[in-house]
Amino acid sequence: MKLWLILGAISGFISVALGAFAAHGLQARVGPAEIAAFETGARYQMYHALALFAVAWVAAQGGGSLASLAGWAFVAGTILFSGSLYYLGITGSRALVLITPIGGVSFLIGWASLAVGAYALRLPGSGG
């Protein structure tokens, strides 16, 4: 559980820092399309930084391997999806564009794993 809290906090921090860089440091270097791609990467990184807090909660409630799968899928998705968009935004190069959808699939695996893991929990007063 502690790992997911730490990774979520670090990822959120990086997302805010990179979002600020996009807003204040990229305009002179690249065009609007590259800035938009970079901002999309930062936005999705923040979404999944917050998702890691949900992973920590499910793990703390006994979500076990499904929570871990979700967490690692979110981390992989952030590296692949957001990372490839950061690269595009900074360099203007589309060399890593084929990695972006792999990161998106990692995000989907994470959300599905989190949903199944949460569904399987036995919480007091939940009737299941």
Regions found by a protein language model. Give the residues of each.
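Polytopic transmembrane helical bundles with strong interfacial aromatic enrichment
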Residues: M1-G128
